[in-house]
C-alpha cells in the first residue's frame, strides 16, 4: 500500500496504490483537506502499514508530512531522485496527477531503500523559521527600497514608513536569533564557525546551519546536491555534449541565501586564483558567482563537520 503525493501551495494530488489498483484524488493543502484525505484512506481500508511519499519542494509539504507522520510511514524525497526515476521510466509528459502516480510507483519500487521522515526537533524548527522569516522581511524591504527610488512625492513618505517598520521587524528577529543561540550553545558554536567564512553573515549562517542540522548529510556532495548547487552535464548520446549547469534541484531558498555572500567573496578576491581560471575560460560572471556559492557551501559543510568531530 503506497501513497504518492504531489504537493503544491493550494492542493495535494494523491495516487494510492492498493491491491494492484491506482486510486487518484485531489485535496486542499490545509487541515480540512488533510481530514478528507484521512477519510478517503479509511474508505480504502488503509492501515498503519501505508507508506506515503512526497517531494521536498519548498515549504508546502511540511504541514502534510507532520500530519501523516502521526498515522503512517512518511518519506520526503529529494526531487532529483524522483526526476531520475522518471527519466528511467521514460515519462515525458507532466501533470500533477501523473506526478502523484509516478511518486507512488517510486515509493513502491524503492520501498526497501527509502528512509522514514523524522519531524524536525523544536530547536531545528525554530531556527529554520526564524531564518526563513528574516529572509522574507529582507526581501520585502529590498522591494520597497527599489520602489522608493521612483516613487512620487505623495507616495514616498508611505514607502519610507513601510521600510522603517520592516527594518524594526528585522532588528527584532535578529534579537530573537541571538537569544536562540544563547539558549543553544551547540548551535552558537557552529554559527560562530560559519561566520569566519568571508561573506557569511547572520542570516546565511542561520540558513546553512538549519539545513545542516536538519538532514544527516554523509559528505559535501550530498550537501551541495541538497542545495541544488551540484554540477550537471547535459549530454546526448556519445558525441553531443551540452554546457554544464547546476542542477537547481534542491532548496531554492537556501541556494538564494548564498548569493550575496558569493558577491562579497568575489569583491574581496577571496577565491582570486579560482575566479581567474574561470575568467580565462570565458565564463560569465553569473556562472562564476554560482561556482563561488558552491565553494562557500563546501567550506561551510567541512567547517561544521570538523566541529562535530572535535
Residue ranges of predicted features:
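Long, charge-rich intrinsically disordered scaffolds of nucleic-acid metabolism proteins
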Residues: 66-69, 75-193
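Conserved small/polar residues in nucleotide/adenosyl-binding loops
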Residues: 308-310
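Short glycine-rich phosphate-binding loop at a beta-alpha junction
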Residues: 49-60
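Short, glycine/acidic-enriched loop or turn micro-motifs at the edges of active sites
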Residues: 9, 58, 81
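Nucleic-acid-processing active sites and adjacent nucleic-acid-binding tracks
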Residues: 20-47, 51
Amino acid at each position: 500500500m503506497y501513497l504518492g503525493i504531489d504537493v503544491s501551495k493550494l492542493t495535494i494530488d494523491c495516487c494510492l496504490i492498493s491491491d494492484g489498483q491506482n486510486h487518484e484524488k485531489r485535496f486542499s493543502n490545509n487541515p480540512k483537506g488533510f481530514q478528507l484525505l484521512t477519510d478517503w484512506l479509511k474508505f480504502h481500508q488503509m492501515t498503519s502499514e501505508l507508506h506515503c511519499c512526497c517531494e521536498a519542494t519548498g515549504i508546502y509539504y511540511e504541514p502534510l508530512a507532520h500530519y501523516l507522520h502521526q498515522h503512517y510511514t512518511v518519506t520526503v524525497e529529494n526531487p532529483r531522485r524522483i526526476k531520475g526515476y522518471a527519466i528511467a521510466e521514460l515519462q515525458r509528459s507532466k501533470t500533477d496527477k501523473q506526478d502523484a502516480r509516478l511518486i507512488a510507483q517510486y515509493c513502491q519500487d524503492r520501498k526497501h531503500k527509502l528512509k522514514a521522515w523524522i519531524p524536525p526537533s523544536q530547536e531545528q524548527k525554530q531556527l529554520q523559521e526564524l531564518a526563513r522569516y528574516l529572509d522574507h522581511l529582507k526581501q520585502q524591504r529590498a522591494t520597497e527600497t527599489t520602489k522608493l527610488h521612483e516613487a512620487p512625492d505623495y507616495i514616498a513618505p508611505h514607502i519610507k514608513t513601510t521600510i522603517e517598520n520592516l527594518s524594526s521587524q528585522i532588528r527584532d528577529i535578529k534579537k530573537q536569533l541571538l537569544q536562540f543561540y544563547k539558549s543553544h550553545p551547540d548551535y552558537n558554536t557552529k554559527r560562530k564557525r560559519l561566520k569566519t567564512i568571508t561573506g557569511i553573515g547572520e542570516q546565511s549562517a542561520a540558513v546553512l546551519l538549519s539545513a545542516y542540522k536538519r538532514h544527516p548529510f554523509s559528505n559535501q556532495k550530498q550537501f551541495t546536491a541538497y542545495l541544488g548547487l551540484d554540477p550537471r552535464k547535459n549530454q546526448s548520446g556519445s558525441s553531443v555534449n551540452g554546457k554544464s549547469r547546476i542542477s537547481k534541484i534542491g532548496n531554492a531558498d537556501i541556494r538564494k541565501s548564498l548569493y550575496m555572500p558569493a558577491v562579497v567573496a568575489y569583491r574581496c578576491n577571496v577565491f582570486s586564483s579560482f575566479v581567474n581560471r574561470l575568467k580565462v575560460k570565458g565564463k560569465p560572471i553569473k556562472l562564476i558567482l554560482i561556482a563561488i556559492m558552491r565553494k562557500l557551501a563546501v567550506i561551510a559543510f567541512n567547517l561544521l563537520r570538523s566541529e562535530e568531530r572535535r
